């Protein structure tokens, strides 16, 4: 390593953990790790620390989890007292006020899970798959007050295939982000301004996004299944659809069963059909199509409605 830097790390979910480990293993001095506060989780609603919090404690690092940063003078002063060369931010979850953005000597550097300016916002991984993009990637940018608008220091592309799922792309981008931030800290590249005319946005997802509309093309629905599992999940009525693929040479009334085999369950769409590979009923284990069909007799014409199959 050319230079040992004093850093703050700011992140919360699994996506951020590889970058924290990479910075620590590279020998940088991580003065403090900022995460979201512990949240109630599980049946007992016990306060549970986030993945970055747990990883930081395992490394023996100081963990801070302020509930807010805006208008929090004590937090701003504590951040300033770290005497940072840079802060590395990866899916932290809180907006950094300008006073904090301006504190580190080299600024606050964000690991964003898209090739900016495409897919600014909260759900870039899912939206890249939903849109049918053939590649995604990570961008290291110097943060400004705008939403993912700062100068870009480095981009690393990652391919998206016709079978790529959100968990697979998430893990590939997390690894790419860890490698990219090490390179940026070592080489200190000049920033390139983003072209706002090319920007598009990835809004926060909700459960409603997972409802499948069978009047849509099968290719689009297959992308929804790949993009929106495990959360918010994809479903039709009470039936969760965990894995599926599109079949183009098929037609029928949208939302009805048009093909059944030993391990094949085809649902007609607005264009083509969706072959359900793995499904789950409420309170039941997930089943592949063959296991599901052994327990459910579904003649052709059976319709998926708000209760599942009818």
From Swiss-Prot:
GO terms for molecular function: methionyl-tRNA formyltransferase activity. It catalyses: L-methionyl-tRNA(fMet) + (6R)-10-formyltetrahydrofolate = N-formyl-L-methionyl-tRNA(fMet) + (6S)-5,6,7,8-tetrahydrofolate + H(+). Its EC number is 2.1.2.9. It is an enzyme of class 2 (transferase). It comes from the Bacteria. Pfam families: Formyl_trans_C, Formyl_trans_N. Signal peptide: none annotated. (6S)-5,6,7,8-tetrahydrofolate binds at residues 114-117. Keywords: Protein biosynthesis, Transferase. GO terms for cellular component: cytosol. InterPro entries: Fmt (IPR005794), Formyl_trans_C (IPR005793), Formyl_trans_C_sf (IPR037022), Formyl_transf_N (IPR002376), Formyl_transf_N_sf (IPR036477), Formyl_transferase-like_C_sf (IPR011034), GART_AS (IPR001555), Met-tRNA-FMT_C (IPR044135). PANTHER family: METHIONYL-TRNA FORMYLTRANSFERASE, METHIONYL-TRNA FORMYLTRANSFERASE, MITOCHONDRIAL. Attaches a formyl group to the free amino group of methionyl-tRNA(fMet). The formyl group appears to play a dual role in the initiator identity of N-formylmethionyl-tRNA by promoting its recognition by IF2 and preventing the misappropriation of this tRNA by the elongation apparatus. Belongs to the Fmt family. This is Methionyl-tRNA formyltransferase.
């Amino acid at each position: 390593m050319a230079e040992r830097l004093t850093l703050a790390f700011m992140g919360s979910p699994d996506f951020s953990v590889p970058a924290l480990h990479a910075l620590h293993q590279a020998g940088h001095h991580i003065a403090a790790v900022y995460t979201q506060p512990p949240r109630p989780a599980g049946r007992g609603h016990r306060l549970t620390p986030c993945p970055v919090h747990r990883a930081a404690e395992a490394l023996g690092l100081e963990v801070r989890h302020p509930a807010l940063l805006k208008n929090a003078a004590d937090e701003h002063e504590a951040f300033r007292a770290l005497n940072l060369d840079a802060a590395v931010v990866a899916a932290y979850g809180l907006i950094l006020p300008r006073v904090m953005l301006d504190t580190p000597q080299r600024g606050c550097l964000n690991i964003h899970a898209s090739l900016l300016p495409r897919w600014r916002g909260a759900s870039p991984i899912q939206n890249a798959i939903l849109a049918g993009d053939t590649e995604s990637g990570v961008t290291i940018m110097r943060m400004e007050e705008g939403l993912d608008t700062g100068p870009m220091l480095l981009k690393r592309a990652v391919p998206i295939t016709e079978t790529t799922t959100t968990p697979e792309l998430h893990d590939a981008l997390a690894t790419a982000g860890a490698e990219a931030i090490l390179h940026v800290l070592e080489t200190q590249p000049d920033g390139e301004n983003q072209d706002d005319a090319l920007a598009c946005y990835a809004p926060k997802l909700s459960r409603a996004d997972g409802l499948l509309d069978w009047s849509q093309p099968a290719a689009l629905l297959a992308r929804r299944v790949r993009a929106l599992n495990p959360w918010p999940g994809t479903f039709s009525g009470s039936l969760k659809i965990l894995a599926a693929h599109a079949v183009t040479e098929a037609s029928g009334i949208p939302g009805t069963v048009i093909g059944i085999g030993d391990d094949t369950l085809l649902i007609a769409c607005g264009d083509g059909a969706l072959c359900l590979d793995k499904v789950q009923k409420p309170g039941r284990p997930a089943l592949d199509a063959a296991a599901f069909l052994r327990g459910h007799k579904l003649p052709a014409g059976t319709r998926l409605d708000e209760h599942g199959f009818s």
